[in-house]
């Protein structure tokens, strides 16, 4: 995806934030996503279960949020750099499914990181029981391929 509008317009609409995210189009919880990953056999079962058990053990709450990682906006500053490194560590240690580790790291950074939730979805082409209108902020690269 490619940004389709001036980032200043997004800041005007949502205010200053470190991350601008879309909610996940189908689920609202990390643990729901883990169940979906396990059911579809999208990653190593033992690894994903180990990740889930660790998150539960350290108190990761259910329904903290789940986000579409296909397109998001990140301000470049020290807190987002630290956030990105912590997220990368989780992806290296556990599942490479980025949506599994993102909410956990976000939870750990919630007192240092300001997040704005964008309206719509990352892609209007995803069939979902929730919102399905796409968004005005990004274009889909597939539309540009000839």
Predicted regions and their residues:
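Catalytic core and acceptor-binding pocket of nucleotide-sugar-dependent glycosyltransferases
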Residues: 43-145
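Cell wall/extracellular polymer interaction/catalysis modules
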Residues: 21, 27-45, 123-128
